[in-house]
């Protein structure tokens, strides 16, 4: 008699609308209960029985109950699940399989089965890709997942690579395809095969995409010719190879190996500027004035060159520093190194005064054995030969940025606008507390930004620099010319790595249109979005593989007295993160390892400091000695403690 009663339905509706609700993100704990985080200030307790309906990271709506003045949340509706597609490890066997997601906050096994069409017979320890199919807040009894892809077996030494690539849905190998003959592009190529072009790279590099040639002019000015590998001479726009490169967007460099953007026949052979091989190039010739500036008379043209020497960074650096035994093959090569060195110093000096120069940070290289085991991690400082190539590439990219801007009005530009305008006042206030006075308006201009950066570089430590980093905007890829504040340049468009960057291939096609005097369409915006997304995924993949290898490398140091110098890179409520100076590993030091009495300890992310009894004991950029307390292989995290 009540089922169709409109009064009862109205009463139910009223009760529902009057019940308090909140939307937020579920945060799990290791103790079974959780919290619904609504914003930075407000969170609600979720009791253990209710946590069984949700997963860490789910965005949900919950009913808020109040009992004895204590509020708790009862999950009611799912807005966005945390897990959709994920990787994990299989438990169980035969028809009773579960999968544990590979995530530090997700420990519960999810019942699963192989999806239709997946032939592999899964067993305990296998790595797999899964997709969530059921969720309790969607009216299902429990969580359930389909296994959509087998990755590898439990003890595969190369699991860090295969699992990471599968997690980010990235390619595992080079694209298929071969370019049989060069295209007829209607370009006249200058024959520069007689000139002493050289390449300078790591000794192991196969995909050499830049060769350099310098000469001194009669008036004492230096002329630099930068020849760049020419994959667009082989790959037609819109072809199968071009579309594959467009999707990949970049060569993916992971510790130990790379997954190229182009087929290896092209990247490591046909296009690579190998010594004593004739190769087509896109070439830029510029004149460096006495003060290091680049003359307006910039020439882009197609050419053929023959590199006369494959030089290695360390050999060239040793020779210039008068150390080591290596010698150039002949006086012609020696003369090139000397001239390129002069250009490097001249351009470096100009950038120091008129743009910005990055501080040199070492690169860390993993030395791997046959089975992917980490034999060593070597810090490779950026030496003078690295800087020769860097200065030449920056100069060439600056030339391309100018030419594309002036002749076409578009291109693929790297744009960085410095500080977010919304943060300008807060930035000025922070700097003022440290005795630096800046105008909030001026610091948003390229000149004002450069001026501040130079003042920060002159500080005795990098502490203040680290504090203002959060106010900076991110670099973007844009078809519109714009300044690059980070480099201190009015515009920056890369074209010097077309074997490994699709954006550089696009700029090659645009520059060729300029050379031929043809009109060409502006690149589509969705291409820049794809490049930005791929760059993000590749960086995450590199970091994930690195974390795994660092955990393997330092595992046997856990619990020992081995000391490592470590730079504090971040402070949070729970402790601080440090980077080991010798190998680049990042470790976490919990607050409990810093001081036993929690009430006497203040960890301030805002200030980048840790105070004990009101006194600053640690701050970001400090270098301290640490030991490794624990390595958690399941989460690839390293826990350190200050050395006694």
Swiss-Prot record:
Its EC number is 3.1.13.1. It comes from the Bacteria. It is an enzyme of class 3 (hydrolase). SUPFAM superfamilies: Nucleic acid-binding proteins. InterPro entries: CSD (IPR011129), NA-bd_OB-fold (IPR012340), RNase_B_OB_dom (IPR013223), RNase_II (IPR011804), RNase_II/R (IPR001900), RNase_II/R_CS (IPR022966), RNase_II/RNase_R (IPR004476), RNR_Ribonuclease (IPR050180). Pfam families: OB_RNB, RNB, S1. One of its GO terms (biological process) is mRNA catabolic process. It catalyses: Exonucleolytic cleavage in the 3'- to 5'-direction to yield nucleoside 5'-phosphates. It is found in: Cytoplasm. Residues 561-643 form the S1 motif domain. Residues 189-516 form the RNB domain. Keywords: Cytoplasm, Exonuclease, Hydrolase, Nuclease, RNA-binding. GO terms for molecular function: exoribonuclease II activity; RNA binding. GO terms for cellular component: cytosol. Involved in mRNA degradation. Hydrolyzes single-stranded polyribonucleotides processively in the 3' to 5' direction. HAMAP family: RNase_II. Belongs to the RNR ribonuclease family. RNase II subfamily. This is Exoribonuclease 2. It comes from Salmonella arizonae (strain ATCC BAA-731 / CDC346-86 / RSK2980).
């Amino acid at each position: 008699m009540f089922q169709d009663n409109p009064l009862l339905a109205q009463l139910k509706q009223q009760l529902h609308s009057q019940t308090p609700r909140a939307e937020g993100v579920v945060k799990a704990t290791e103790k079974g209960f959780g919290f619904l985080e609504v914003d930075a200030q407000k969170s609600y307790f979720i009791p253990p029985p209710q946590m069984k309906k949700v997963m860490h990271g789910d965005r949900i709506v919950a009913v808020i109950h109040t009992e004895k003045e204590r509020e708790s949340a009862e999950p009611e509706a799912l807005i966005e699940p945390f897990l959709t597609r994920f990787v994990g490890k299989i438990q169980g066997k035969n028809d009773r399989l579960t999968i544990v997601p590979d995530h530090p906050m997700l420990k519960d096994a999810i019942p699963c089965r192989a999806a239709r069409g997946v032939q592999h017979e899964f067993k305990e320890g296998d790595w797999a890709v899964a997709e969530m199919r059921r969720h309790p807040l969607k009216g299902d009894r429990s969580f359930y997942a389909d296994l959509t892809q087998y990755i590898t077996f439990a003890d595969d030494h190369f699991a860090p690579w295969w699992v990471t690539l599968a997690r980010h849905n990235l390619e595992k190998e080079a694209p298929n395809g071969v370019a049989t003959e060069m295209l007829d592009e209607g370009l006249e190529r200058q024959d520069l095969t007689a000139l002493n072009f050289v390449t300078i790279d790591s000794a192991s590099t196969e995909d050499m995409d830049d060769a350099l040639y310098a000469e001194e002019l009669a008036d004492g000015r230096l002329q630099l010719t930068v020849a760049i590998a020419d994959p667009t001479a082989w790959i037609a726009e819109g072809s199968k190879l071009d579309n594959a490169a467009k999707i990949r967007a970049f060569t993916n460099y992971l510790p130990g190996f790379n997954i190229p953007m182009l087929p290896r026949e092209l990247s490591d052979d046909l296009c690579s500027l190998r010594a004593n091989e004739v190769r087509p190039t896109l070439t830029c010739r510029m004149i460096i004035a006495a003060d290091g500036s680049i003359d307006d008379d910039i020439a882009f043209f197609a050419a053929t060159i023959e590199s006369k020497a494959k030089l290695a960074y360390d050999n060239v650096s040793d020779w210039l520093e008068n150390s080591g035994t290596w010698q150039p093959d002949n006086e012609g090569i020696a003369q090139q190194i000397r001239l390129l060195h002069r250009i490097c110093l001249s351009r470096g000096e100009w950038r120091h005064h008129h743009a910005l120069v990055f501080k040199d940070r070492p690169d860390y290289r993993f030395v791997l054995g046959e089975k992917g085991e980490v034999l060593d991690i070597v810090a490779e400082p950026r030496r003078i030969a690295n800087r020769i190539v860097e200065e030449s590439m920056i100069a060439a990219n600056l030339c391309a940025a100018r030419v594309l801007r002036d002749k076409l009005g578009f291109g693929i530009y790297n744009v960085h606008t410095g500080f977010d305008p919304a943060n300008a006042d807060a930035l000025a206030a922070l700097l003022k507390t440290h005795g630096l006075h800046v105008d909030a308006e001026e610091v948003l201009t390229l000149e004002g930004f450069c001026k501040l950066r130079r003042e920060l570089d002159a500080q005795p430590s990098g502490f203040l620099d680290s504090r203002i980093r959060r106010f900076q905007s991110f670099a973007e890829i844009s078809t519109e010319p714009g300044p690059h504040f980070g480099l201190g340049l009015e515009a920056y468009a890369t074209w010097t790595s077309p074997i490994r960057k699709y954006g550089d291939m696009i700029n090659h096609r645009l520059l060729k249109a300029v050379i031929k005097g043809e009109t060409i369409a502006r690149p589509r915006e969705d291409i820049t979005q794809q490049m930005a997304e791929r760059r993000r995924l590749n960086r995450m993949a590199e970091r994930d593989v690195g974390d795994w290898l660092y955990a393997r490398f330092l595992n046997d140091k856990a619990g020992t007295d081995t000391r490592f110098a470590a730079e504090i890179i971040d402070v949070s409520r729970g402790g601080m993160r440090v980077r080991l100076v010798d190998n680049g590993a990042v470790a976490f030091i919990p607050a409990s390892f810093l001081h036993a009495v929690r009430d006497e300890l203040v960890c301030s992310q805002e200030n980048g400091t840790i105070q004990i009894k009101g006194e600053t004991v640690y701050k970001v950029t400090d270098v301290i000695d640490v030991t490794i307390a624990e390595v958690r292989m399941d989460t690839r995290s390293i826990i350190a403690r200050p050395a006694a």
